[in-house]
Amino acid sequence: MALSMDNIVISNEEEIYMMKAMHIPCGLYLNMVLKAAIELDLFEIIAKSTTQKLSSYEIASQIPTKNPNASSLVLERILRFLASQSFLTCNITKNDDGIVHTSYNLTPLSQSLISDKDGSSIAPFLLLATDPVAVNSWFHFKDAILEGEIPFNKAHGVHAFEYHGKDSRMNGLFNRAMQNVTCTEMKRIVECYNGFQGVKEIIDVGGGLGISLATIISKYPNIKGINFDLPHVIKDAPTYEGIEHVGGDMFKSVPQRELILLKAILHDWDDEYCVKILKNCWRALPKDGKVVVIEQMQPEYPETNLISKNSSSVDMLMMTMLDGGKERTKQQFEDLAKQAGFTVFKIVARAYYCWVIELYK
């Protein structure tokens, strides 16, 4: 009789927390296994199969391995691990001859790691987070406390944005990750937030490659968009119908439009720089216009729900990568808006862990 642990009830609190504590280091193992799985296209191979249920040998035969038989034995262990972490389901059947056949298929969790109909997924963000350039920064995390240094700067000698400008591989990895995450987030935002309706022109300040505007305009094709970012950023931006890429510096000035979008910009900067950005937006805004800020938000008191865990994790990322970058509370955002001259601050929607804030003069 096969051993199953699903019916084991652990009621001893000390045992529960000890097992949870022992599982903490496994977070690193999971991320590195997922990195390998993505690089080998394991999830995409399963997704593209006609049955969406494949054995380890069937998967191994579709990856560039020299020996599928030997590789399938290693792969079987990896697939079992991913199934134990809810990224796959395991299906075991026995034919009339008593031969056991094991196959694996995707779960809702692993669906986020395969490309959707628009070609976006969370996979590029995981590859960015597990890249040696990013990982090396975490080895200097304690220096943020001991020496007041930025871990990324300590590891690489330059600011993260400066590093991306010099390393084309890392810059491409970063841009792909941000484009995919932004696409996923913005598709949900345009579903739950109707504040773009009736708007004629939008400028996306710090818009990167323009994916936020492209997603908005796909739903509201009458909108004309300006994607505003540094010249070296927009030079790689693709052409989108209805979008003009304009080079500039948001710390100097922002072009005037009736709606100014700031998505995941303020969390990159300290309070002083944030106020400078917001003041430039205030100056560029017509009297009846609005600034739409999209950011993660910290609760006033630490909470253990998924939204809070996500924002707290990203706050640690900001601490590691950027000088002054951080996730903020509602009150902290409101204080920044007031300092910049805005009189109306409204939280109007939430998509996943992103909050949509409207600012008015």
From Swiss-Prot:
<dbReference type="InterPro" id="IPR036390">
    <property type="entry name" value="WH_DNA-bd_sf"/>
</dbReference>
<comment type="similarity">
    <text>Belongs to the class I-like SAM-binding methyltransferase superfamily. Cation-independent O-methyltransferase family.</text>
</comment>
<comment type="pathway">
    <text>Flavonoid metabolism.</text>
</comment>
<keyword id="KW-0808">Transferase</keyword>
<dbReference type="GO" id="GO:0009813">
    <property type="term" value="P:flavonoid biosynthetic process"/>
</dbReference>
<dbReference type="InterPro" id="IPR036388">
    <property type="entry name" value="WH-like_DNA-bd_sf"/>
</dbReference>
<dbReference type="GO" id="GO:0032259">
    <property type="term" value="P:methylation"/>
</dbReference>
<dbReference type="GO" id="GO:0030755">
    <property type="term" value="F:quercetin 3-O-methyltransferase activity"/>
</dbReference>
<dbReference type="GO" id="GO:0102449">
    <property type="term" value="F:kaempferol 3-O-methyltransferase activity"/>
</dbReference>
<dbReference type="InterPro" id="IPR016461">
    <property type="entry name" value="COMT-like"/>
</dbReference>
<keyword id="KW-0949">S-adenosyl-L-methionine</keyword>
<dbReference type="InterPro" id="IPR029063">
    <property type="entry name" value="SAM-dependent_MTases_sf"/>
</dbReference>
<dbReference type="Pfam" id="PF08100">
    <property type="entry name" value="Dimerisation"/>
</dbReference>
<feature type="active site" description="Proton acceptor">
    <location>
        <position position="267"/>
    </location>
</feature>
<dbReference type="GO" id="GO:0046983">
    <property type="term" value="F:protein dimerization activity"/>
</dbReference>
<dbReference type="GO" id="GO:0008171">
    <property type="term" value="F:O-methyltransferase activity"/>
</dbReference>
<protein>
    <recommendedName>
        <fullName>Myricetin 3-O-methyltransferase 3</fullName>
        <ecNumber>2.1.1.-</ecNumber>
        <ecNumber>2.1.1.76</ecNumber>
    </recommendedName>
</protein>
<keyword id="KW-0489">Methyltransferase</keyword>
<dbReference type="InterPro" id="IPR001077">
    <property type="entry name" value="O_MeTrfase_dom"/>
</dbReference>
<comment type="subunit">
    <text>Homodimer.</text>
</comment>
<feature type="binding site">
    <location>
        <position position="229"/>
    </location>
    <ligand>
        <name>S-adenosyl-L-methionine</name>
    </ligand>
</feature>
<dbReference type="InterPro" id="IPR012967">
    <property type="entry name" value="Plant_O-MeTrfase_dimerisation"/>
</dbReference>
<comment type="function">
    <text>Flavonoid 3-O-methyltransferase involved in the biosynthesis of polymethoxylated flavonoids natural products such as myricetin derivatives, aroma compounds possessing antioxidant properties and exhibiting pharmacological activities such as anti-carcinogen, anti-viral, anti-thrombotic, anti-diabetic, anti-atherosclerotic, and anti-inflammatory effects. Catalyzes S-adenosylmethionine-dependent regioselective 3-O-methylation of flavonoids; active on various hydroxylated flavonoid substrates.</text>
</comment>
<dbReference type="Pfam" id="PF00891">
    <property type="entry name" value="Methyltransf_2"/>
</dbReference>
